[in-house]
Amino acid sequence: MSKNENLKNNIDYKKHYENDNIFYKEIIKERLINNSNIIESLNSKELDPECPADYMGEHLLPFYMIYPTQDQAKNYICFDTSFQEIPRYNKIMKYGQIIFNIVCDIKEIYDKNTGIARHDLLAALISKEFDWTNLFGMQVHLVSDKPMSVDNNYIGRTLIFEQTTPNSIIKEQKVINKSGG
């Protein structure tokens, strides 16, 4: 396979069910960058809200890790997925979690337009966007909403959404065709 074919195959993981982590994170990314209220509430000094895709990798991170050294106060929405524990006597379904860690710089913790703590506002907007939806094929619902403190500079909130979803029962089409089954 050529380098371009390999790249195309890797990019295709964003569109197909073969890898739940990549597929779910792509849906989350699209929902976040297309929600102007979330983008504006992140209050970025260096990015233009009219170019929300630029927020990916800067304020929207598909993992829980914030950059240790910064010149300006920043607010983050970190998201991740987790799939575990097959329900008892059911090998077809598994439990899935979508985890949001909202981390806000203490220097700009209050949203000046609303007077609401920024991490609470972002949590409410994320809940509105994802709770009780079927965005991932099966309904997700919020099961945990807890405050967190990262250090003396950041505070935040962790949201966990859960669902029961099919347990990797889809095989990549090329594998099915090559093996004949």
Regions found by a protein language model. Name each.
Residues 16, 109-117:
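Short, flexible/disordered intra-domain loops and linkers
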Residues 1-90, 180-181:
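Small/polar-rich, solvent-exposed N-terminal microdomains that initiate assembly or binding
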Residues 87-93, 150-154:
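Short, solvent-exposed beta-strand/turn "edge" segments of beta-rich domains on protein surfaces
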Residues 23, 74, 95, 117, ...:
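Short, well-structured alpha-helical interface segments that form or flank functional binding sites
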Residues 128-129, 177-181:
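Short, cationic low-complexity segments
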Residues 80-82, 99-103, 160-164:
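Residue-level recognition of well-ordered beta-strand positions that form the cores
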Residues 116-171:
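Acidic-leaning, charged glycine-interspersed low-complexity segments
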Residues 95-111:
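Short acidic, glycine/tyrosine-flanked loop/strand segments centered on an H-E-D-like triad
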